[in-house]
A protein has these predicted regions:
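Conserved end of the kinase activation segment
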Residues: 77-91
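Conserved structural core of kinase catalytic domains
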Residues: 1-12, 61, 67
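Catalytic-loop of the protein kinase fold
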Residues: 20, 24-41
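Conserved C-lobe activation region of Hanks-type protein kinase-like domains
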Residues: 88-92, 101-130
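Activation segment/activation loop of eukaryotic-type protein kinase catalytic domains
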Residues: 36-78
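Conserved hydrophobic alpha-helix
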Residues: 16-23, 101
Length: 130
């Protein structure tokens, strides 16, 4: 949305955060947080379109999310070779949510994609996040 007004972008960010809160209130986790999980309408309404990888708590039976996009994965999970058998938390989602909001407000940029001021940074987003 390069031509959208700031207030529109703030409403979109708020609506994405609200969708995460609703999912969390029901005991579930988004898990595979990424920029392709949502569609945004002209009225700033947000629609979830990628829910097949949610971590679902169905009356005490936990159905895990076994996939994820590394650019939206929190630092403490960057070293995992696989998400198979790993239980995610709301806090893991919140890291991805913060990145999504940053993307919305700053033209699709990732907060770890800036120009590094030290020589060993900037080779890969995953290592910069970790």
């Amino acid at each position: 949305y390069p031509h959208c007004a700031w207030d529109f972008l703030l409403y979109v960010a708020r609506n994405i955060a609200s969708s995460f809160a609703t999912i969390h209130e029901h005991g579930h986790v988004v898990g595979d947080v990424n920029q392709n999980s949502f569609m945004v309408g002209r009225d700033s309404k947000v629609v979830l379109i990628d829910s097949d990888s949610f971590q679902i708590n169905a009356n005490g039976t936990l159905h895990l999310c076994e996939v994820g996009v590394s650019h939206f994965t929190p630092p403490e999970l960057q070293t995992l070779s696989s998400f198979v058998g790993f239980e995610r938390t709301e806090n893991h989602d919140n890291f991805g949510l913060a990145l999504l909001i940053f993307h919305v407000l700053f033209g699709g940029r990732h907060p770890y994609s800036g120009v590094p001021l030290i020589s060993d940074a900037g080779n890969a987003l995953e290592t910069d996040i970790a």
